[in-house]
Structures are given as C-alpha cells and as structure tokens.
Design a protein with these regions (language model features):
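Subtilisin-like serine protease catalytic core
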Residues: 1-83, 100, 170-173, 182-185, ...
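Extracellular S/T/G-rich loop segment that most often corresponds to the catalytic His/Ser-adjacent loop
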Residues: 3-22, 147-238, 251, 278-363
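Hydrophobic, small-residue-rich alpha-helical packing segments that form membrane-like cores
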Residues: 40, 73, 81-98, 104-110, ...
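Hydrolase catalytic cores
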Residues: 44-47, 52, 65-72, 93-101, ...
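Structural recognition of the beta-strand scaffold that forms the well-ordered cores
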Residues: 45, 56-57, 63-68, 103-108, ...
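Short acidic, glycine-rich surface-loop motifs adjacent to enzyme active sites
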Residues: 67-69, 89-117, 140-141, 249-253, ...
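Catalytic cores of secreted or luminal carbohydrate-active enzymes
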Residues: 104-105, 122-153, 402-406
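Edge beta-strands of jelly-roll/beta-sandwich modules across compartments, strongly enriched
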Residues: 255-267
Length: 406
C-alpha cells in the first residue's frame, strides 16, 4: 500500500504455511514475528481466537488483521516507534475500507513519553481516525498504577525537591518533566555523588561516574506545555547508572502562574522494579495513547481479589478527562501461547482484547446485520460504558474502573 517496506500475507498464504506441518518450513513461507514473548499471539487469541474445549476468543468468528510492527535499531531486537504504530493503524484501516468491513483496532501498547493530555501527534492521530470509516479504537490503560513512575508537585508550595531511586543494573534512565510554559523556575538534578546540575536548558555533562544530558522542548503547535527530557547514562568507566537516591530540585526565578509539574519515568517494561519516585502520585498513570480522545481505554480487573488490579493505570488525564472508561478481567487470563498450547497472561494488554472482542460482536449485530449501521466510534463507546457494571467499593464513574466492568 505504498509504505516502502514490509510484506503482506493473506489467509491462504498463512493456511498453506500451517498445512506443511513443519514449523521451520512454514516460517520460511510466512515468517513468524511475535518474538519469544508471544504478546501479539495472546492478545489476538483473547479477542478472536478459535473456540475449543479449553478456551477461545470473544469474537471467535471475526477476521483478524495482524500487523507486525517494524523494529528500529538495537541488538536486542530494537524498539517500535510511534510513527510505525501509526502506519500499522493506517494499514489496518485501509484494509478494512478495501474489504468493506467494520473494524476494531486493538492497541495493547503504552508509553509515558508525552504530557498525558491527549496532545501528542500520536494521540491526535488516533483521535482523528475516529471520523474515518466504521471503526473503534480500544487501548490498554497500561500497568503503571503502582509502578512509582509518576509524581505531581507544585513548585509554588514549600515542596521544591522530588526524590527518586535508581536501582541496580540500569543502563539508561530517561526522565520526562512537563511544566507550564508560563511558569518561571530553574530545574536542578542532584546526583548520589553530590553533583548539582542545572538542567533547565540543553546541557551535556560527562564524567567517569555519570553522563547527563537534558533537552529543553518548547511549546509546539500540538501542546502549550514545556518539556525537559533528562537522560541519565553510565559514566565513562561504568557499565550501569549509579544506583541510589537522585533528586530534582526546583528554584523559582520569576512569576508562577500555575506551579503544577508532572514527571514520568519510563514504563515498567523499560526499567527495573527498584527504580521509581520515593513519594509517587498513583493517579494520572494511564499510559499514552489511552489518553487520546474518542478511544475506549481499558483498565484491568482482578477477578480473584474482586477489585481493580493494583497495577492498572489510573486517571484522570493531565487535562482532567476520565480514563480509563471501562474495565475487563486482566489477571491470569487464558490465552494462546507462542508455539502452541495455552498460557496465563496478566496486564491491561490482556483486558483490552476482551473489550475489543465484545465491541466486534456488537458491531456485527449493528452494522453487518443492519440493526444499527451507526454502531461504531463514540456511539459504541456510549453503549458499552452505559451497560458496564459498577464494581463494589469503587467510585462511579471513577479513575480506576471508569464506568464499570464488562
């Protein structure tokens, strides 16, 4: 479709490869791309896997468009850029239009790289496709609820220092500091070795013990906020970042019109469990792009405990919108395993495809069977949230369960 890379395999190609009965030969015909984690396999099986005596997907007769995302750099398999995810969404949407079929786009992915207010290019793109074709975008809320990766502070108060711990064996720690452009103050990074570095502007500090780089990002056409992104890497003589207590210090230099500062560390998939803020803010921990507008953001319910999972990302967004909007079972979910068999998966990544499956069934009833050909997008979100069941002990609507459980 004009992307300049990749290959397309239809159902006949995939079935022919499976019919060989030889895994090595079948992967020569259709390369496997899910990696050893089996994340994509599990997600797809929960949403639309075939039914059998042990398990099965929700919308088990649905067609599946599986998009393997491009990886960039890195000897460990690299990483996926948000632009690659946007191209994957574009491909799926174009294919649905070509086939004249409604589509549920499931995104079991999340990042902390953004202000969490719906205004990144990534979030705006996902919001904008709501008006294209008969679709709904379902997004996992992320597993950052108890991760200690977010803190909110007010520089106009007496609290002007925020401490965070860096655990052992970290190779690179990135810290995202979002402030209002209208506020005037300087930002300092204090290291365990006693250095105090002004990171208010672009700066690079290299030594035997630590390498620090800060980048100041001014307001853009997409956001009026200001970002200071800090990268902490090992010193020239070390393999890992110095572990210990680091801190961010704020020094007011002029007018403070708001004073609120939000800071995020990377998600739990990127850093160790020992790394985090000492006094974290568990709210506003829903990951991007679940913070986009006009998407169905999904939290995880712990069916064993009878309550929302402690790891499930919490709202509100940084600009005060309710997220997540809905919840589904997200602990020990049965899913297809990579290479065969069944596995148990935990996380909002595996709650979201349950909602995607339910959405597909409702869209079939409405659009395919012509009971309501407008049953997609915001209308579908409205109906699903209306008939969700409130969780006992949770605020309704609330920043943990949204409008309730399906």
């Amino acid at each position: 479709m004009g992307y300049g890379y990749g290959a397309q395999y239809d159902s006949s190609d995939i079935n022919s490869a499976l019919d060989t009965g030889n895994r090595g030969f079948s992967e020569m015909l259709v390369p496997a791309s899910d990696g050893l984690s089996g994340h994509g396999t599990a997600v797809a099986s929960i949403a639309a896997g075939s039914r059998n005596s042990q398990s099965g997907g929700i919308a088990y007769e649905s067609e599946i468009i599986a998009v393997a995302l491009k990886r960039t750099g890195g000897s460990d398999g690299g990483y996926t850029r948000t632009i690659d995810i946007m191209e994957g969404i574009d491909y799926a949407l174009r294919k649905a239009i070509e086939l004249n079929m409604p589509i549920v786009i499931n995104l079991s992915f999340g990042t902390n790289e953004g202000a969490h207010d719906g205004n990144t290019l990534f979030e705006n793109y996902i919001t904008d496709i709501n008006g294209i074709w008969k679709n709904i975008v379902v997004v996992a809320a992320g597993n950052e609820g108890d991760s200690r990766h977010h803190v909110r502070t007010d520089v106009s108060s007496n609290i002007n220092r925020t401490e965070f711990a860096i655990g052992d064996n970290e190779k690179n720690i990135r810290l995202f500091i979002w402030k209002y452009f209208q506020d005037e103050f300087e930002i300092y990074l204090n290291t365990p070795s006693g250095k105090r570095i002004n990171i208010s502007n672009d700066v690079t500090v290299s030594s035997q013990r630590e390498n620090i780089e800060s980048v100041l990002v001014m307001p853009t056409p997409y956001t009026s906020k200001q970002l200071v992104e800090v990268s902490i890497r090992p010193g020239n003589s070390l393999d890992y970042v110095i572990s210990g207590i680091w801190s961010i210090e704020f020094a007011v230099t002029g007018t403070i019109k708001c004073g609120i500062v939000d800071m995020w560390l990377p998600t739990i998939e990127a850093i160790g469990l020992s790394t985090g803020f000492l006094r974290p803010s568990p709210d506003t921990t829903v990951t991007i792009p679940a913070t986009a507008r006009k998407v169905l953001s999904v939290g995880a319910f712990n069916q064993d405990a009878g309550s929302m999972a402690t790891f499930s990302g919490r709202g509100y967004t940084a600009d005060g919108r309710l997220v997540p909007l809905i919840a589904a079972y997200g602990v020990d979910v049965t899913a297809a395993g990579y290479g065969g068999g069944y596995v148990r998966k935990t996380g909002t990544s595996f709650a979201a495809p349950k909602i995607s499956g339910y959405a597909a069934c409702i869209m079939e009833w409405g659009i395919v069977r012509r009971n309501d050909e407008n049953m997609y997008g915001e209308k579908l979100i409205a109906y699903m949230t209306r008939y969700a069941v409130g969780i006992e002990g949770e605020e309704m609507p609330g920043i943990r369960q949204g409008w309730g459980l399906i």
